[in-house]
Amino acid sequence: IKFSKNNKNSKFRIVYCPPNTLIRPLSKRLKKTNLEVGAQNCHESENYGAYTGHVNSKMLKNVGAKYVILGHSENRQSGETDKLINLKIKSAIKSNLKVIFCIGETLSEKRKKRTNKVLAQQITSGLKSIKNTSNIIIAYEPVWSIGTGLIPKPNDLSNSISFIKSKFRKKTPKVLYGGSVNNKNITEIKDINVIDGFLIGGASQSSKKFIDIIKKTFN
C-alpha cells in the first residue's frame, strides 16, 4: 500500500485477489490508492438460494470486489467444466464485475501439440453467447507452468498469446500471462510485446518480491 501511494506511474494497474473474508476490509483500506480488489472465484447462480457455503457474484460485488478470477486451472482440476465457467462469467458480468478468465493447456496437451486447439476450445466454450467482452481479461496460464518454475520459451509464449488475440474479431481483450512469474524471470518475459500484464501467484505473497516485479516491469 505504501509503495502504491508513493508510486506516480499511471501505466500499471494492480488487482489483489485475496480470500473472500478479506475482500471487504481490503476494499475499504485501499479506497484512496490505485490498488483494486477482486475475488478468486464465484458461484454461478445469479440469485440467492440453497447453495450452502458458496458465494455468488452479487455478494462479491456487495463487499467491494471489482474483479473475479474464473477458470483457474486449480478449479478446472477439481472438476470445473467449460460450461460451468461460462455460467460463472455470465453471472459475474451481470453483477458488473470484471472477469479475469484463465485458460491454458496441460503438459500432455502441449506435448501432443494441441495447445492452440485447447485454447480455442476453452475460449469458445467459456465465452459462449457472450457478445460484449469489454469486461473480460484473458489470463493465459499453462497448467504445466504453474508452481513449477518452468515458463514457455519467449517465442512459444508470444505465439500462444497472439493466437488467443486472433480469436477475437472485434474488440481484442487484454491478455495476461500467468505461470511461475517471479522477480527473477520477469525481465525475460516483460519485453514480449503481445503480453498486456501478468497474473502473479506465489510471488505476490512476498511484498518485497511483488514490488520488485512491478519495478522491473516498468524499467
Regions from the language model: what does each represent?
Residues 1-219:
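Active-site loop-to-helix "anion-binding N-cap" substructures in soluble metabolic enzymes
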